[in-house]
Amino acid sequence: MSASTMTPGEIVSELDKYIIGQNRAKRAVAVALRNRWRRQQVEEPLRHEIHPKNILMIGPTGVGKTEIARRLAKLANAPFIKIEATKFTEVGYVGRDVDTIIRDLTEYSIKQTRELEMRRVRTQAEDAAEDRILDALVPPSRGTSGEPERGEDSNARQTFRKRLREGKCDDLEIEIEIAQPVPQMDVMTPPGMEEMAEQLRGMFAGLARDKKKPKKMKVKEAFKLIVEEEAAKRINEDDLRTAAIANVEQNGIVFLDEIDKIAARQESGGADVSRQGVQRDLLPLVEGTTVNTRYGMVRTDHILFIASGAFHLSRPSDLIPELQGRFPIRVELESLTAQDFVRILSDTDASLIKQYSALLGTEDVQLDFKPDGIERLAELAFSVNERTENIGARRLYTVMEKLLEELSFDATASSGKTITIDAAYVDAQLSEAASSQDLARYVL
């Protein structure tokens, strides 16, 4: 099922496979995605006036803020970029300016669209590559003009075509003309001058042209290179750019992480000048403006912005009022409980238990996680979070890594065995580190 036609309920069900809890946040992003489809059904000129409702997610680290946005973008197959607000500085200061967010998003969309187009023309490209390789293996007769005349395949050519498709010619060496890729010119510019760097790269790329050069290689390697070359010939670059820019403008998603770090705190001093400057620079992007990229002008009016932050030392009200108004939907994410940790370990589609079982399974070591072992792991992770820094579900990575440290190191010695992970095994491996606050701080 295409994500563009999924109902909010179906989107939430899909997110439930990877993220435990946080139903309010899931519902908010599901409605935002569905509203994109609804907007496309509205007639112009009203359609142009309907803007996405940007979302502000508030919650401690490790509760699923980033994962929700990442899974949503994957589900929607939309251009998506995650950036940290702290990476940017006010225009005029040393550092990256906020326009690079849209440039990076456009680059991603170009790559995504190119891959889609490559898949579309792949069959034609493979047929052309097959003919070129057969020309090298069984040269066709030449006509009066000197051009190859393939006509009907000769018996020898048909035989080689059959062998080629069966993979029996893969190790034969042939000499074939391959386009030499133009070396990428890397332009070094001071921070804040990314636009100039893009223009210079485009200028140098326009001066260079691909040159063909005869090269000896095996058929298998040659086939792969020729398919890429033939596919590139069949793609119209202008149409590709137009489609990629339209995809960014209509479906792009920007995830602004750590937005609380650029919120001005009332008790702090001079550093707030730059923080407020970044907020002011973000305003036109979020509200809707035009950004110049190497592929053309990109409008940001219908790009969805999802901001997130823990807001431990500041509050959403510490953001400048204009920026607060650009994020009308606010969702608070709850801290995770020990029971949530149990579900994260066992219920999600790509749970840590499945990941580690698959990794050690490659060495013929079978892991058998018992329910009491999973519960004990969750309790230990939750306990360490309460006594030290609360890093949410990320604590499970540390706990699992420590639990299986010895086993991972000596996996070959346990080849062919089944290791039972129950509460006793977990206590034997982790109880000392978990019970000592000093050890827990540094080890877990």
Swiss-Prot record:
Entry GO terms, CC: HslUV protease complex
InterPro entries found in the cross-reference section: AAA+_ATPase (IPR003593), ATP-dep_Clp_protease_ClpX (IPR050052), ATPase_AAA_core (IPR003959), Clp_ATPase_C (IPR019489), HslU (IPR004491), P-loop_NTPase (IPR027417)
BP term (GO), one: proteolysis involved in protein catabolic process
One matching Pfam family: AAA
Region (Disordered): 137-162
Any one GO molecular function term: peptidase activity
List of residues binding ATP: 20, 62-67, 257, 322, 394
Organism domain of life: Bacteria
Intracellular or extracellular location(s): Cytoplasm
Keyword Chaperone attributed: yes
Gene3D superfamilies per the UniProt record, alphabetical: 1.10.8.60, DNA helicase RuvA subunit, C-terminal domain, P-loop containing nucleotide triphosphate hydrolases
Role noted for this protein: ATPase subunit of a proteasome-like degradation complex; this subunit has chaperone activity. The binding of ATP and its subsequent hydrolysis by HslU are essential for unfolding of protein substrates subsequently hydrolyzed by HslV. HslU recognizes the N-terminal part of its protein substrates and unfolds these before they are guided to HslV for hydrolysis.
Family classification: Belongs to the ClpX chaperone family. HslU subfamily.
Summary of subunit composition and partner proteins: A double ring-shaped homohexamer of HslV is capped on each side by a ring-shaped HslU homohexamer. The assembly of the HslU/HslV complex is dependent on binding of ATP.
Protein's name in the database: ATP-dependent protease ATPase subunit HslU
Name of the gene: hslU
